[in-house]
């Protein structure tokens, strides 16, 4: 729950890929201080009020072992078809989200270790009035980025709209997702190289 009277929002961490450009699965990547990106992503979503947090793993299923024992309310979602691309990961994660009582989900890839919880909170707050029909994404300098919030009423359509390594961007654009400027909080940059 996001606290107070706000509707429940679950978090999704997309971490199933092989990380070809990175040189290995980003689910196994760590900050210079040794903090796993996976742990950072889960804690960021939890700090923003997301519960549960679903972690989609495929190429590196053992990455779940990197999560500290003190992190509660995390569900590992296996993605056996991870090699089919981002679409397989979104299908698995949104399918798992359907078993929660969440009205919406916040989606982040594991390769945005700099993402602050404040950006997640801002996107959640901006989309809250729409409830299950919410559709929003952070923007940085006018460019779309993460996090992305998808209301429950969109989950099936989003899952049907993605294929291969094509994510939900086209769906978000076609359905006029609310653009939430977050460039005052962070650069929006993902990490593609070690």
Task: Please report, for each region that a protein language model flagged, where it lies by residue.
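Conserved alpha/beta core of the MobA/IspD/sugar-nucleotide pyrophosphorylase nucleotidyltransferase superfamily
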Residues: 2-7, 160-194
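Nucleotide and nucleotide-moiety/phosphate-recognizing core
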Residues: 4-144, 176-182
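Conserved nucleotide-sugar donor-binding
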Residues: 102, 143-157
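Short, glycine/charged-rich beta-strand-loop motifs at protein surfaces that mediate ligand recognition
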Residues: 111-113, 155-162
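A residue-level structural signature of the nucleotidyltransferase/glycosyltransferase Rossmann-like core
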Residues: 112, 146-149, 188-189
